Amino acid sequence: AIENRFGLKYWSGAAEDHICKPFVGIEGYKEKGTAVTFSKYDLKKLFADEGFEYQRLYYVLPDYKFPVVIYTDKYVPNASTLSKLAFSYIDNSILLWNEAKLYKDIINNNVQDFFANSFLIEVSRVKLENNQPVYITAKAEARKPYRVTTLIYDDRHIEKIPVHEAAIAHI
């Protein structure tokens, strides 16, 4: 898992997670010797150049440290789902707008992969297994009876997993 250098949170003014300054990633990391993050294109190329021909990319929101929605190009969440996410930012952030309010236009323009805040990526030199989850939601912050993780698979079957014993009744 890694942050997306072009994640919407960074365009919104969030400080870069490793350097604690806003805009440094989208400006190309001008300071030498600092931690860096990568775009989708950069990650895919980096792994392909190392012989990892098979790749599966997941997009994570709000980010990989606090995942609530994990999705793929095969199953994009609707804007309503994303507009309800709680986003948090580290100190030194200079927020220019409400990130959640932009997702409708981002999804309607099919650029959600470019602006995803984080990535999970599976890479392999051999073909990856088929029928993996294409969409996952986790409600760890909900009240105990509603803490359910939902997985939607490539073949569109749905699996619900209770995260708390009290949530079993809601499956």
Language-model-detected regions and their locations in the chain:
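Conserved class I S-adenosyl-L-methionine
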Residues: 1-23
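Short catalytic/ligand-binding loop motif for oxyanion handling, primarily in non-cytosolic enzymes
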Residues: 6-11, 63-69, 129-132
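C-terminal alpha-helical "lid/dimerization" subdomain adjacent to the S-adenosyl-L-methionine
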Residues: 15-38
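Short alpha-helix
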Residues: 32-59
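Conserved catalytic loop of SAM-dependent methyltransferase domains
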Residues: 55-92
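Core SAM-dependent methyltransferase catalytic element
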Residues: 73-77, 110-132
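Conserved Class I S-adenosyl-L-methionine
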Residues: 88-120
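ATP-binding glycine-rich loop module of kinase domains
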Residues: 135-171
